[in-house]
A protein has these predicted regions:
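Bacterial Sec-dependent N-terminal signal peptides
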Residues: 1-26
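Pepsin/retropepsin-fold aspartyl endopeptidases
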Residues: 20-400
Length: 400
């Protein structure tokens, strides 16, 4: 009885301390559920979960950086700022419409996975993928233990997505939130589900948020996993061997690779690329996006400012789409040459898109038609990327 009494007292003290901690959290106000965040020197971003009382707390996973910086969380009528550091979380409350309390957590903690295997203390983890006919990095995995499902690794995505039509219950997705999702065509309000479990081979991720897009025509369902899954790792994409290799450090041998500076931001991962239009060279920062089905796309404002089309041949028009029903018309021009580090690629088609296609601070997107020709090492923590030509290098970038 003494042991039971002692445990009861300890539990009571713990519960009381948790309640007091929640009571002492800072409070801001909101009249609307949409929010914005300014993370360090980056522009204010709007692609975040809506405030809700259904999920406690609502976790906002901000940039996983090794740099401390100031971060401000905005509602429509109020704001709160924190000096954030790597591997930390910051809690507060939002009083919504003067009556509902939303519990909020800003997190710079890494999205780590666990290993469900014996003697798996290796320095790296290897994932086999299939490079599909539609040029997608496709991995076999599972969602909420509901059976095998295709997972597409999209380096341009910062979140996980499920795309299907009326399939949320089949795959164990509990729809309990909304978010503003940003794609090449702008912002759209989508449904979200939390928590979820994803598994690839012996690697398991718990407490994952998934954005659910109920798209007509997608009867089988599929998952898109973003860079958020591997943000704490060095990621090697080997198209020759169809392997993803995850490690904590750069490989010992990176001979033959060219090093390229990168910017990993709240809006994505960007690499510096040089375009030669026949008259001059222009440098810009492009989103590193294995989920984009083209070679290059460019923000219309960046093109206009640098007169990039001047001297380049228009070879057609096209569409850039985030879904079958959500797209933008674009002009397609041909760049005589582009450079990525020491690697030169000839006759690269560029889609010239609209103003709202990307964060205006950046030039555009480099897609899979170029990236598939280059084995890649992404060092997220140290902001460097490494490229090496592979067996697909030299394939024409022009669509047949």
């Amino acid at each position: 009885m003494r042991l039971l009494r002692t445990l009861t007292i300890i539990f009571s003290i713990f519960t009381t301390s948790v309640v007091l901690a929640q009571q002492n959290l800072p409070v801001i106000k909101a009249n609307q559920t949409k929010i914005s965040i300014k993370d360090g020197d980056e522009p204010v971003t709007h692609y975040w979960n809506h405030l809700s009382t259904k999920v406690k707390p609502i976790v906002y996973n901000v940039l996983k950086s090794n740099v401390s910086r100031n971060l401000t969380f905005y509602t429509d009528i109020d704001s709160i700022s924190f000096n954030v550091s790597p591997g930390k979380s910051y809690d507060f409350k939002v009083l919504l419409m003067s009556k509902d309390t939303c519990y909020v957590k800003l997190s710079t903690e890494e999205n780590s996975y666990s290993k469900i295997c014996n003697n798996c203390d290796s320095l790296s983890d290897t994932i086999q993928f299939i490079f599909s006919k539609s040029e997608e990095i496709t991995i076999k995995g599972s969602l909420n233990n509901t059976g095998i499902v295709d997972l597409i690794f999209d380096t341009g995505a910062g979140y996980n997505y499920f795309i299907g039509n009326g399939l949320n219950e089949k795959f164990g997705l509990k729809i309990n939130g909304l978010m503003e999702d940003e794609s090449v065509t702008g912002l759209a309000t989508e449904q979200t589900s939390f928590p979820n479990q994803l598994q690839i081979s012996s690697l398991k991720w718990n407490n994952q948020s998934i954005t659910y897009i109920d798209e007509k025509g997608y009867t089988g369902g599929g998952v898109i996993i973003g860079y958020n899954m591997f943000e704490n790792k060095v990621v090697k994409i080997d198209y020759d061997k169809s392997l993803l290799i995850l490690s904590d450090e750069l490989p010992v041998d990176i001979s033959g690779y060219t090093s390229v500076p990168m910017r990993h931001t709240t809006g994505g991962t960007y690499i510096e690329l040089t375009i030669f239009n026949g008259k001059k060279e222009i440098k810009g920062w492009f989103l590193f996006d294995t989920g984009a089905s083209f070679a290059l796309s460019m923000n219309a404002d960046f093109e206009s400012k640098n007169l990039i089309k001047d001297g380049m041949k228009k070879i057609g028009t096209g569409r850039i789409a985030s879904t079958e029903s959500d797209y933008q018309e674009v002009d397609i021009v041909l760049a005589p040459k582009i450079k990525l580090g020491d690697i030169e690629i000839s006759d690269a088609p560029i889609n010239i898109g609209g103003k709202n296609m990307f964060q205006l601070k950046y030039a555009g997107i480099v897609g899979i038609s170029i990236l598939k020709q280059l084995n890649t090492i992404v060092d997220y923590k140290n902001q460097r990327m490494y490229f090496k030509t592979n067996n697909m290098f030299g394939i024409s970038l022009k669509k047949k």
